C-alpha cells in the first residue's frame, strides 16, 4: 500500500483537494489492489503489457493498440506529444504516427494511422482507474488518482464530472458508515467547488448530516461543540439559512432555561457548588440568556468555592515537608511556617519571619527575633516561642530535631515581643532550620495569616473551609475543595469543562499539550519556581542492594534521558527538566542561584546496559566469594520491588525503569504506594522512588540523608561530609561542602539520582490573583478571587 504523506512533494500535491485530503485518506475503506478490478478493456491492455502495479508508481506512458490486421498487439510507448494532449480525429490516409517504444528508448518508430485501433493516454488511463475505484467504493485510491490528475493534467476530459461523482458518492458512503464529521466536510467541499451540482440533493444531504451531527454531540453531552456547530452553520448559510439552525437554537434556549431553573432550585437548598455548575452550563449554552450572568455573579458573591484537582492527598500537612508534595501543599493552606522560604538568592534562600522581623549578627552567632502584635489572637509571645525552640532541641521530645539541636546554644527572652537565639557555632542560614509550623496558641485560633481549616472528607473530596477571624473579601473563596483523581485525563476533561478550576502538579507531557491547545486563551499553565529532584532510594537490605557496584549497574541500566524526554516530557524539552548526577538540583542554567550545591564536574553516567551486565557479574563474583568464606551459598538476584508514589509521572517512570532492568536480567515489580513510608517503618519495598524539594541544599542535605530522613544513610563518608557541611562558617565552605557531598554520593550511590523535573499547574481564567511561578500552589492564596462575568 502506498503511504500518501510520505514526502513533501506528495503533501504539496494534495493541496488542491483542501480539507478532504486527510478525511478521505484516513477514513475511507481499506485500499484494494488493482488486481481485484474487473477485466475492463483497460485492464486487459495493461495485463497484456505486463503493467499490474499502480499507474501512479509508473513513469508516465501511453499505449498504442494496433488493429487486428496489423497484429492487434498493444505497445507501451513514451507519452506522445499531441497538441494539448488531445488525440487528433482528422488524420488522413497515408499519415503516420511517430512513437518511442519504451523498450528501445533511443529509437523512433512510425506507425500508419490506419493501423492504429486505439490510443490510451496516461491521464485517460488514470481517469478510467479512478472511475472503477469510485464504482467499487475504493475512495482512498480514487482520491489519489483524481488529485494527481488535478495537479498534473487538470484539462483531462471528464475530470470535473468524475470529481463531482467522487465527492457525492464518498459523502454518501461516509454518511452510511456514520462518519458524520467527515461526510459533512466532503459535502461542503462539493458545494463550494460545484455550487450548481445537484443543488437540492446536496443541500438536503447537508441538512440531514448537520442535524445528525449536532444531535450526536448533544447526546454525548458535548454541548460546547454542538453549540459551536450551530453557530458556524448560522454564519456560513446566512444567505440561505438551513432549517436545522432555527430548530437547534430553540432547543438550546429551552435547555439553558432548564439549567437556570435547576440552578435556582439548588441555590434555594444552599447547594452553591451545584447551583454554580448548573449556571455555568446555562451560560455555556446561551451566554446572553436574560439574567444569566447576574445569577452566576450572585452565586459567586454568596458562597464562592474553588475546586482543585489533585493526584495525591496527605493526612499530615507540613509546611517543611521535603519529600511529600501533598503534605507541603496542604500545609501551605492550613499552617504558617515560622520562617517561610520565598525564593532563591545570591547566597542561599530568601526567608520571611512570619511573626515580624529578624536580624542575624555579623559574626553569625546570634539571631534576633522581633514579634509584632505579640499576645494578639493566634500570635505567640516570645516565651511561647522560646519553649518551642527548646523542645525541638531536647532529645526525647516528639518534635526533636537533631540538626537544630546541633547548633542551638541558648534562647534569651527580652519581653513579650523579643528574643535572641545563640548558636554553638556560626551558621550561614540558621533560619533555614526554622520552617516548622507556628504552633497554635489555642484550639480555637490559628496562626496569623492562616485562612482555612480542614472541614472534612467526602469521598474523594477534601474540604477546607474559611476559618479566619475576619470575613472573606467579595468573591474570595469561602471553601477550597481538593478533588482526588487517579486518571490525569479525567482530571483534564473535568478541568476543561469547568468542574474544577485548578489542576495541581500536571503530568509534564500533559502540561505541554495544554499549553499548545486551542483552550490556551481560557486556561493558564504556570510553572512552579523551582524543580523537584527525583531519585531511587534503597530501603531494604540484601547482599546485592548493599553492594555499590550492583547499585551502579542498576543506574547504568536506566536510560534516564529517554525516560525523561520521551515518557515524562512527551518528546519535548524543558529548561528545568534534565538528568542529574547527584542529590541536588542543577537549575535551568549553570548560573541559576539554586545550583550552588551542584558539582558540574561530576558527569552523568551514560546509559550502558552492557557495562551494567559486566558490573553485575563482578558484584556477583565478589559476593559469591564472600558467601563461600562463610560457608554460605549466594542466592540468586531477588525480584526487586520498586515503590512509587501514586501519581502519573512516578508510575510512568517506575514502569519504564522496571522494564529496563529486565534487559540486564534483574527481575522487578512495580508497587504503587499511596504514602512513602519513613525509614523508621518497616519498608514494604526494596527501593522507593523519591521526589524531593531540595531547595536549600545547605540545610536540606541533612534533612535528606540524616537520621530519620527519607534517604537516611549510615555510609561513613556521607555522614562525615554532612558533619563538615554543618560546620561550614561561610558560603565558600558551604558551596565546597555541598559539592564534595555531591561527589561522594555519585561515588558511593546511597541513592540513584535520576533527574530534576520542572513542576507546573493549570488554572482557569475565572480565577485570578494566583501568584506567577510560586513555590507552592497556595503560596498567596489570600489573593485568590473569582472574576465575575
Question: Residue locations for each model-derived region?
Answer:
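Ligand/substrate-recognition segments at binding pockets and active sites
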Residues: 240-241, 459-460, 618-691
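Extracytoplasmic/peripheral linker and loop segments enriched in polar/acidic and small residues
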Residues: 264, 290, 577, 669-677, ...
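N-terminal lobe/hinge region of extracytoplasmic solute-binding protein
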Residues: 310-363, 447-448
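Gly/Pro-rich hinge or "lid" segments in bacterial periplasmic/extracellular proteins
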Residues: 328-332, 336, 343-344, 416, ...
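Surface-exposed binding/hinge segments that line
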Residues: 364, 370, 374-379, 399-443
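Ligand-site clamp/hinge motif
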Residues: 372-375, 467-513
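Structural transition elements
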Residues: 574-625, 646-652
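Long beta-strand-rich cores associated with HINT superfamily self-processing modules
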Residues: 763-789
Amino acid at each position: 500500500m502506498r503511504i500518501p504523506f510520505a514526502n513533501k512533494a506528495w503533501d504539496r500535491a494534495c493541496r488542491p483537494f483542501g480539507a478532504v485530503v486527510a478525511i478521505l485518506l484516513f477514513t475511507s475503506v481499506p485500499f484494494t489492489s488493482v488486481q481485484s478490478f474487473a477485466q475492463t478493456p483497460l485492464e486487459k491492455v495493461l495485463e497484456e503489457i505486463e503493467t499490474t502495479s499502480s499507474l501512479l508508481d509508473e513513469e508516465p506512458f501511453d499505449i498504442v493498440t494496433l488493429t487486428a490486421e496489423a497484429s492487434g498487439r498493444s505497445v507501451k510507448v513514451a507519452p506522445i506529444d499531441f497538441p494539448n494532449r488531445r488525440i487528433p480525429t482528422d488524420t488522413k490516409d497515408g499519415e503516420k504516427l511517430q512513437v518511442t517504444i519504451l523498450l528501445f528508448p533511443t529509437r523512433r518508430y512510425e506507425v500508419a494511422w490506419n493501423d492504429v485501433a486505439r490510443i490510451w493516454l496516461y491521464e485517460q488511463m488514470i481517469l478510467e482507474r479512478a472511475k472503477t475505484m469510485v464504482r467499487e467504493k475504493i475512495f482512498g485510491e480514487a482520491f489519489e488518482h483524481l488529485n494527481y490528475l488535478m495537479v498534473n493534467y487538470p484539462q483531462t476530459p471528464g475530470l470535473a464530472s468524475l470529481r463531482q461523482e467522487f465527492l457525492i458518492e464518498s459523502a454518501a458512503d461516509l454518511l452510511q458508515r456514520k462518519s458524520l464529521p467527515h461526510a459533512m466536510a466532503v459535502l461542503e467541499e462539493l458545494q463550494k467547488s460545484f455550487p450548481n451540482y445537484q443543488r437540492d440533493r446536496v443541500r438536503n444531504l447537508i441538512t440531514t448530516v448537520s442535524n445528525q451531527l449536532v444531535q450526536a454531540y448533544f447526546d454525548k453531552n458535548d454541548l460546547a461543540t454542538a453549540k459551536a456547530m450551530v453557530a458556524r452553520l448560522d454564519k456560513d448559510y446566512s444567505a440561505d439559512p438551513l432549517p436545522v439552525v432555527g430548530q437547534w437554537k430553540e432547543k438550546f434556549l429551552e435547555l439553558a432555561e432548564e439549567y437556570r431553573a435547576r440552578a435556582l432550585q439548588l441555590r434555594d437548598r444552599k447547594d452553591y457548588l451545584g447551583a454554580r455548575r448548573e449556571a455555568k452550563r446555562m451560560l455555556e449554552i446561551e451566554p446572553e440568556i436574560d439574567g444569566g450572568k447576574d445569577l452566576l455573579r450572585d452565586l459567586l458573591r454568596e458562597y464562592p468555592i474553588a475546586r482543585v484537582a489533585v493526584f495525591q492527598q496527605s493526612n499530615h500537612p507540613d509546611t517543611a515537608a521535603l519529600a511529600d508534595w501533598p503534605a507541603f501543599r496542604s500545609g501551605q493552606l492550613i499552617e504558617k511556617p515560622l520562617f517561610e522560604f520565598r525564593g532563591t538568592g545570591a547566597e542561599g534562600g530568601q526567608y520571611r519571619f512570619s511573626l515580624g522581623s529578624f536580624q542575624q549578627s555579623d559574626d553569625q552567632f546570634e539571631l534576633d527575633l522581633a514579634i509584632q502584635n505579640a499576645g494578639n489572637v493566634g500570635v505567640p509571645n516570645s516565651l511561647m516561642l522560646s519553649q518551642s525552640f527548646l523542645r525541638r532541641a531536647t532529645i526525647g521530645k516528639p518534635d526533636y530535631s537533631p540538626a537544630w539541636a546541633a547548633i542551638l546554644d541558648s534562647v534569651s527572652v527580652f519581653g513579650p515581643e523579643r528574643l535572641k537565639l545563640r548558636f554553638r557555632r556560626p551558621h550561614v542560614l540558621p533560619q533555614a532550620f526554622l520552617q516548622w509550623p507556628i504552633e497554635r496558641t489555642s484550639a480555637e485560633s490559628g496562626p496569623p495569616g492562616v485562612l482555612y481549616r480542614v472541614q472534612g472528607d467526602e469521598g474523594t473530596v477534601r474540604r477546607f473551609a474559611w476559618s479566619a477571624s475576619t470575613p472573606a473579601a467579595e468573591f474570595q473563596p469561602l471553601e477550597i475543595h481538593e478533588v482526588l483523581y487517579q486518571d490525569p485525563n479525567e482530571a483534564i476533561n473535568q478541568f476543561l469543562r469547568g468542574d474544577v478550576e485548578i489542576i495541581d502538579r500536571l503530568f509534564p507531557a500533559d502540561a505541554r499539550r495544554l499549553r499548545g491547545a486551542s483552550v490556551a486563551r481560557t486556561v493558564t499553565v504556570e510553572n512552579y519556581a523551582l524543580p523537584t529532584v527525583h531519585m531511587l532510594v534503597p530501603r531494604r537490605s540484601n547482599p546485592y542492594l548493599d553492594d555499590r557496584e550492583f547499585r551502579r549497574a542498576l543506574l547504568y541500566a536506566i536510560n534516564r534521558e529517554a525516560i525523561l524526554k520521551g515518557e515524562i516530557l512527551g518528546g519535548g524539552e524543558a529548561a528545568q527538566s534534565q538528568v542529574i548526577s547527584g542529590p541536588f538540583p542543577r537549575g535551568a542554567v549553570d548560573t541559576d542561584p539554586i545550583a550552588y550545591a551542584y558539582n558540574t564536574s561530576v558527569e552523568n553516567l551514560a546509559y550502558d546496559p552492557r557495562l551494567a551486565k559486566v558490573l553485575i557479574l563482578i558484584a556477583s563474583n565478589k559476593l559469591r566469594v564472600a558467601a563461600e568464606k562463610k560457608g554460605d551459598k549466594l542466592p540468586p538476584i531477588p525480584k526487586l520491588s520498586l515503590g512509587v508514589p501514586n501519581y502519573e509521572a512516578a508510575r510512568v517512570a517506575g514502569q519504564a525503569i522496571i522494564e529496563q532492568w529486565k534487559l540486564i536480567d534483574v527481575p522487578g515489580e512495580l508497587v504503587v504506594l499511596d504514602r512513602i513510608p519513613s525509614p523508621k517503618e518497616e519498608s514494604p519495598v526494596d527501593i522507593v522512588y523519591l521526589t524531593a524539594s531540595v531547595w536549600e541544599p545547605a540545610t536540606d542535605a541533612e534533612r535528606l540523608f540524616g537520621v530519620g530522613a527519607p534517604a537516611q544513610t549510615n555510609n561513613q563518608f556521607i555522614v562525615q561530609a554532612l558533619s563538615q557541611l554543618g560546620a561550614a562558617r561561610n558560603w565558600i565552605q558551604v558551596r565546597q561542602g555541598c559539592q564534595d557531598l555531591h561527589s561522594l554520593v555519585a561515588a558511593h550511590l546511597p541513592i540513584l539520582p535520576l533527574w530534576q523535573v520542572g513542576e507546573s499547574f493549570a488554572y482557569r481564567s475565572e480565577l485570578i490573583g494566583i501568584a506567577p511561578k510560586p513555590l507552592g500552589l497556595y503560596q498567596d492564596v489570600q489573593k485568590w478571587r473569582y472574576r465575575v462575568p
